[in-house]
């Protein structure tokens, strides 16, 4: 039981007016450690008990059983709890040493399936830093949910269908050359895509041709299909190379095209329930009762839209995986689309539509400007990762020129730096892409956390220390206490990150833990012979375990030496 739950239970025994959960949510952490470790504000009881909060705090502090605390005291309208440092540090260190990487593991999910719709790059377009967010946020959410006992199923919903393929086919037939494309597929296809978009602005006829070619593709025309398959195969070679560098893998590559033969069922259900209405030759579903505009299901030319395919996708996933959560990690600009999708599925009678969650995220910009594939204004991810690794290697060679496996460590640090920087940003916020800031060993960065972990491993090697599960390690100084409280809160942070679908909670926790350890390291002579030496080393060991596991949840490696 974590200390906040323990305190909430003890307060509930003397405050029947509030339930344990309400009390738990009211508990605060004082800004000044002199005011205790946990505080309960008595304001909420003033109306009920018809007394001043200060008086209530004083009376309750007297009634609470203080035997398991260092002390309990009222300060103004607050009841302040000072925890027993020695006994809690003993419990926490014992738990981490015993459970190791399983520390913080929970069984909330009990093997239930969570599907993650993620990454979803567009075929025939370069993999840019814009795709990074969906990829790494969803991968981290997958690790976090697995830590809670769920079975995380990662699905790459490739952008391999849509009018853009009509555009690309028209561009290729007008200006393309097979040998040129095969020599450098993504770059050449991007040139064609940018050119057709620019020319279509001046010549709307090209747009119409693109629509016709996409309709041919939907109807199974051989020439259209062969070109599409070729574009797809060439693109996947590059994508898989990048996923290997990112150390991200998928359980399924089900692109939009996978659902082409699965859309009729959804449309049939809409027809059977008389939900389809005609509007200007197109077919729509009225969503007025959800305060949403009508959902366009089929265009007047019979071509389907994203929502039609996403209906089929959701139905397939529910039937195949029986998910308890179907999570879509997709940018904020798709928010309206997912509201409509959920509403249409609800109208179709699928209660599981409530389990569909759109996890949105903010934009990545460069010099505060939006990136756009259509305008050719993008940052390619692969050369960016290579540059990050190169910068990491330069810093490693300066710090530790004799390090073995320098290239492997540089890869872990460089790629980890890019991922960590993305993940430490509050999910709903965007960020400006700054490689220099990402790869810095100072500040709130991935390399800073990795370097702290490697520093601890160096201390443990010097001391030749391996903790003993039977030894009662405990500490009661202020510096170690800050670390102990963080270690104790690891499981609660994992739960909160899952509840909010936000890995930045884990990234910020890792930064805070690394900072607390480095303060401890600066003020404590860990290796000096003393009664507390082994307990201090046990604290180092426990910190390293939790730092490494925090990084793993984010999909970032923790090198043993740097």
Swiss-Prot record:
Q: Name one GO biological process term.
A: arginyl-tRNA aminoacylation
Q: Enumerate the subcellular locations listed in this protein's record, separating them with semicolons.
A: Cytoplasm
Q: Identify the CDD domains for this entry.
A: Anticodon_Ia_Arg (cd07956), ArgRS_core (cd00671)
What is the residue range of the motif 'HIGH' region? 121-131
- A Pfam family found in this protein is DALR_1
Keyword terms: Aminoacyl-tRNA synthetase, ATP-binding, Cytoplasm, Ligase, Nucleotide-binding, Protein biosynthesis
SUPFAM superfamilies in alphabetical order: Anticodon-binding domain of a subclass of class I aminoacyl-tRNA synthetases (SSF47323), Arginyl-tRNA synthetase (ArgRS), N-terminal 'additional' domain (SSF55190), Nucleotidylyl transferase (SSF52374)
Can you list the GO cellular component terms from the UniProt entry?
Answer: cytoplasm
Check the record and name the SMART domains matching this protein. Arg_tRNA_synt_N, DALR_1
Q: Which InterPro entries match?
A: Arg-tRNA-ligase, Arg-tRNA-synth_N, Arg-tRNA-synth_N_sf, ArgRS_core, DALR_anticod-bd, Rossmann-like_a/b/a_fold, tRNAsynth_Ia_anticodon-bd
The UniProt record lists the keyword Cytoplasm = yes
UniProt-listed Enzyme Commission number(s): 6.1.1.19
Q: Which domain of life is it from?
A: Bacteria
Catalytic activities: tRNA(Arg) + L-arginine + ATP = L-arginyl-tRNA(Arg) + AMP + diphosphate
> Taking the first listed entry, what is the main subcellular location of this protein, grouped into a coarse class?
cytoplasm
Task: Give this protein's Gene Ontology molecular function annotations.
Answer: arginine-tRNA ligase activity; ATP binding
Q: Does the keyword Coiled coil apply?
A: no
Q: What family, per the record?
A: Belongs to the class-I aminoacyl-tRNA synthetase family.
The entry describes its oligomerization and partners as:
Monomer.
Q: Which HAMAP family match?
A: Arg_tRNA_synth
Q: What is this protein called?
A: Arginine--tRNA ligase
Say which species the protein is native to: Streptococcus uberis (strain ATCC BAA-854 / 0140J)
